[in-house]
């Protein structure tokens, strides 16, 4: 049981970002589980923020993730067009603020130039190959996507196939996948 949630740990999601062929794609499943129960199958965990120039996806406690998304949007207003700077400033706040420190979530964010994972430990990580995944099925999705990167598949096809594979393996991930895309500068 989580110290913040008397019903047990909230599980369930897989979020992946794939950067390939001039596109950046973020995909996430719709399942929200509480303990061993599926609470919702069509949650929207991937969305556009920052005037539509940034895509963001989250894993973890939903209310916590929304709090962090709101904070990131404020940082993007403060540092327009500077996703890396906004993410680092959010991570600093997350790590040092007494209230934020207790939030249980992780985020992937991407714009036309950079993809980042932001964690509650204050980490801002840029993936080595432009592909990264988080959540309960994240490792399965990441392995599948990396295996598909040298194929003729588009970034969206790679992301969708990786999500399908993760959903086949991870009980906390479903096949109700939402995808957001942006043109990539690299």
From Swiss-Prot:
It holds the Pfam family Proteasome. GO terms for cellular component: HslUV protease complex; proteasome core complex. Signal peptide: none annotated. Its main location: cytoplasm. It is found in: Cytoplasm. Its EC number is 3.4.25.2. SUPFAM superfamilies: N-terminal nucleophile aminohydrolases (Ntn hydrolases) (SSF56235). Allosterically activated by HslU binding. The keyword Glycosyltransferase does not apply. Belongs to the peptidase T1B family. HslV subfamily. PANTHER family: ATP-DEPENDENT PROTEASE SUBUNIT HSLV, METALLOPROTEASE TLDD. A double ring-shaped homohexamer of HslV is capped on each side by a ring-shaped HslU homohexamer. The assembly of the HslU/HslV complex is dependent on binding of ATP. This is ATP-dependent protease subunit HslV. The gene is hslV.
